[in-house]
Each structure stands twice: as C-alpha cells, then as structure tokens.
Amino acid sequence: RQRQMCIRDSCTGAGDDNLDIDWGYQGKLQFVIVKQSSDAGDHIVESDNTNADASVGYLTEPRSQPIISNFTFISNGKDDVIKLKEGVSGIYTNGIVIDASNSKACIETTKAETFQDAATTPKVTFNSVAFDCKALAVLGDDAGTLAQAEALITTGSNNLYSTDSGGGSYVPTVTGFINGTAERAMTVAD
C-alpha cells in the first residue's frame, strides 16, 4: 500500500480540530505548523481508528497510522493538544507540542483499545519531540491508567519534557512558530 504524502502544511484559526485523522488514514505529513488562534479550535490532532464506531471494532484494519514529522503544534488551551483514541496508531517525529496557556495536557487518550494497540505493531510512538503543557497526559473515557497513557509517550527516544510535562528541564524558546536555541539543540531522529 502506498502512503499519500503532504509536505508543508500550515493551519491557523480552525474552529475544530486542525488535523482530524480517522477511518484507516495512513498518510505522511511533513513540515507541519499549527498555531491556534486565541478564541477558536479544539485539539490540534484528533486521531482515531474507526471514529467512535464500536460496532465495527476499534482495531479494525486498516488501522489509522499517520506519520507526522518535522512539526510545530502550539495550542491555545481550548483542549488537550493531541487526542489519541479508539485503537489508533501513529508515528510522531521531530516536533514540538506546546500549550501556550499552560492549562491543558499535551496528550489525551481515550478508550482501552488505544492501550491494546500499544502492545501491537504498529503502535503510537513519539521520537525527538519536545513537550510543554500543564501535564504530559490525561485520560478520557474508558482509557486505562495514567501510567499507560504516559508510557505511550515516554517509551520513545530523545524526547524533551518541561517540568509539568514529564518532570524534565525543557524550557521552550520558540518565537512565534520559529524554533529557538532549545529546540535547535534537540537530537534529530531519522
């Protein structure tokens, strides 16, 4: 199966989710900038497998597996930055996840199938991603444990975490959506 690829995507001012992924989407997005306006927008990414349709089974194939690389996600705090649900897979590489209001989590997970997926291949992975939000992860409906949610994120390599987002020492130096010294010093993943 060939993956569709989107290169150089920017989203601003969306009234709902900026990247709404579901029903088996397996494309690649590279060089993505999302900076939400202060008065609109939900999640920057809402990624699910079968769009809340339990009648067909959340782990139905093909499972959604977006591959998103070289991205900057700056949230306005209306909702958690990335929502993973219903058995979704996904690969997030070389990115920044910031809640500018410091009032929401970087990742929200819902449905137990999201964690069942973590034990299968492909799974959700984050590599070389900087996180700065009020919390690293929160749980939505029927979502397992907070430790499971955080493990989806922290099992990756070369990630940076702020004090609130995983107990690290990362302090964002982003200006607008341009990387600063802290972001340019990150280890880059292939």
Feature names for model-found ranges:
Residues 1-4, 8-190:
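Extracellular beta-rich repeat passengers
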